[in-house]
A protein has these predicted regions:
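C-terminal substrate/ligand-recognition segments
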Residues: 364, 511-530, 579, 583, ...
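Glycine- and hydrophobic-rich flexible loops that cap the catalytic core of alpha/beta enzyme folds
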Residues: 1-293, 534-535, 539-557, 563-596
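Active/binding-pocket-proximal capping segment
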Residues: 227, 325-333, 337-346, 391-392, ...
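Active-site-adjacent bridging/hinge elements
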Residues: 7-14, 45-63, 177-187, 200, ...
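Intrinsically disordered, low-complexity N-proximal targeting/linker segments that flank membranes
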Residues: 197, 393, 397-514, 518, ...
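Secondary-structure capping and boundary motifs in well-ordered enzyme cores
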Residues: 68-75, 185-190, 198-205, 278, ...
Length: 596
């Protein structure tokens, strides 16, 4: 990698400057054009317009060198259009005088002896024809643009390339000739270093370098790199018309068919410490399934290069196969990966949603490749799919309750794809004793997840229950409060059998330990008033004055049946024995729901 401050005249030393044929289009607008022109017209000030990242392409014997535009497509295109607009505003005599100079920056010849010139910047398929209309061609040593529409025919509905040309042409038309000449010479002054050119060698990893140098944190899309690699290889193997059809039928209809598609695939999700969009997560998922990407060995920045290296070896059949696989997996991904928010309704019967919610609530995305693999494999066998997904759900919940690590999940995901039977084996390895020990002291987050799904399990079993769907917006409450000393000191501390514990220090330790048992936790449809949360059991149940108690917030069975109904039967004391009794009952339910 080499980085140097340069003027736009660096283009004279380049041959073909290629924007990937299937790259997204030119998108700059009037705000961007206005900012650039305003800066450039301040001749007494130095301006930095940004960076260009170019990557050297593999040299072909006898051909001029070619570079690929990795970043900077927008500003490079804009500067070229600005130069052409200035040129078109010159008098005929001045155009003849400056044509030889400008040709060096906008055109190139394949061989020194050729008469034919080619436009230096090869644009994407979206903009190629429009850019050609603006830049034109070299005829008898003079640049001509016979296909360029007249300015009054270009409007706000026209392609952005044409709009950009119209903007510069009309703005500069209102400047005096001296200003236009000065700007033209200023741009083509080799000492006017307005950009930083970052030149990458063929072997350099463009995504890793882009991430490093871009302090604004805007990531180069790994999806774009993979897409370009796929269809550049297709261009090597197939006629151009076939490649365009393949792109439109498989890629475009999948990822950019309409606004909803563009928004979905561009929406970012948190995966560990990184934010990545759905399209990048999909490509990683496919790479894991195919054994191309190993999370234990590879970093995410290596993913595009892993694809590129593999794609470079593909035959036409293999390439078409991969493109079709991506399309098929993308459909499965979009149809099944849910987006959760406060309004989402959950039901126990929706086994795919249930698993994804549990994983999402636990901040686990590692198993997505295995799930997508199963959804594809068993798309016509719902019965087996349900069994396989429940096995994974059981593994996750059992390990969660037993407080087992999650670092090995990357390896497990890969192992499960190779051998589905391992999921049940791993789940069976978590013993009932480990689960019983784990729920004696459980985090608020994990308790909320488990209690919520126990509630939905109960509702699903009861044929009389009409409400089968719930939102995940309940508040966890410790019945014996975390700060119990002030109001609960008069309640005797007892052992599991209900016998009083005489030793004060032992009693204190026992009480503190019981606070965090799942048996001491429930879900309310609203938080208790802060001043009420630490009060004795009776006041917490009934409330005080205008402060509502647990009874008023007991919408869920897990609170009404377990706590309120018990209280109404006369069991008005809540102590360590009560907590143990409920802990054991909940443990039985857990083992019923998530049995392996």
């Amino acid at each position: 990698m080499e980085a140097k401050a340069k003027s736009i005249t660096f283009l004279a030393d380049e041959g073909s400057v290629q924007i990937p044929f299937f790259q997204r289009g030119y998108v700059w607008n009037r705000v961007n054009w206005d900012d650039m022109l305003t800066d450039l017209l301040e001749f007494n000030k130095s301006h930095f317009l940004g960076s260009l990242i170019l990557k050297q392409l593999k040299a072909i014997s006898g051909e001029p060198k070619s570079v690929l535009v990795i970043d900077g497509q927008q500003r490079l295109t804009t500067l070229s259009i600005l130069l052409k607009a200035l040129y078109d505003l010159f008098t005929e005599e001045m155009r003849k005088d400056t044509s030889v100079e400008l040709v060096k920056y906008l055109f190139y010849k394949k061989y020194a002896t050729d008469r034919k010139y080619y436009i230096k910047i090869t644009h994407s398929r979206v903009d190629a024809n429009y850019f050609k209309q603006v830049i034109g061609e070299v005829q008898d040593g003079v640049i001509q643009a016979p296909d360029l529409p007249s300015i009054d025919k270009i409007d706000d509905q026209s392609n952005k390339i044409l709009q950009c040309y119209r903007y510069f042409y009309t703005e500069l038309q209102n400047k005096d000739e001296e200003t236009r000449i000065k700007l033209f010479n200023h741009l083509l002054n080799s000492e006017n270093k307005i950009i930083v050119l970052i030149d990458l060698a063929e072997h350099d990893n463009e995504q890793a370098i882009f991430d490093t140098i871009n302090s604004a944190g805007i990531r180069l899309s790994g999806t774009d790199i993979v897409k370009n690699a796929l269809f550049q290889r297709a261009m090597e193997l197939l006629p151009k018309e076939d490649v365009i059809s393949l792109y439109e039928d498989c890629w475009e209809k999948t990822f950019s068919l309409d606004d909803d598609s563009i928004v979905f695939w561009g929406t970012q999700k948190s995966t560990g410490r990184l934010m990545r969009d759905h399209s990048e997560i999909l490509l990683q998922t496919i790479a894991v399934i195919k054994g191309l990407y190993d999370p234990e060995k590879h970093t995410l920045s290596e993913l595009p290069d892993l694809y590129k290296d593999k794609i470079a070896t593909y035959s036409e059949t293999e390439l078409r196969g991969l493109i079709n696989e991506i399309r098929e997996y993308a459909t499965i991904y979009r149809d099944n990966i849910p987006s959760f928010d406060g309004s989402t309704l959950y039901s126990y019967e929706d086994f795919v949603q249930r698993l994804f919610h549990i994983l999402d609530a636990c901040d686990i995305s590692t198993f997505h490749p295995y799930i997508i693999f199963l959804l594809k494999k068993y798309k016509d066998d719902e019965k087996t799919l349900k069994v396989r997904l429940k096995e994974l759900e059981t593994l996750v919940i059992k390990r969660l309750l037993a407080k087992q690590e999650t670092k090995s999940y990357n390896k497990l995901c890969k192992d499960f794809i190779d051998n589905e039977a391992q999921v049940k084996t791993k789940a069976d390895a978590v013993s009932q004793a480990q689960i019983q020990a784990g729920i004696k002291s459980i985090s608020n987050k994990n308790a909320t997840i488990v209690l919520f799904w126990i509630e939905l399990f109960r509702r699903n079993k009861d044929v009389k229950q009409s409400v089968k769907e719930l939102k995940y917006n309940y508040s966890l409450e410790h019945l014996l409060p975390q700060k119990w000393e002030e109001h609960w000191a008069s309640v005797p501390v007892v052992d599991d059998a209900g016998n009083a514990i005489a030793d004060p220090e032992t009693a204190k330790q026992v009480r503190y330990s019981k606070v965090y048992s799942i048996g001491n936790m429930t879900l309310l449809n609203s938080r208790l008033n802060t001043s009420l949360r630490n009060y004795i059991f009776l006041r917490k149940i009934e409330g005080e004055g205008r402060k509502k108690g647990i009874r008023q917030y007991s919408e869920l069975w897990i609170t009404k049946a377990d706590i309120i109904d018990r209280y109404d039967r006369g069991e008005t004391v809540w102590n360590e024995a009560s907590i143990t009794q409920r802990e054991n009952a909940l443990c039985c339910e857990l083992l019923e729901i998530w049995k392996s």
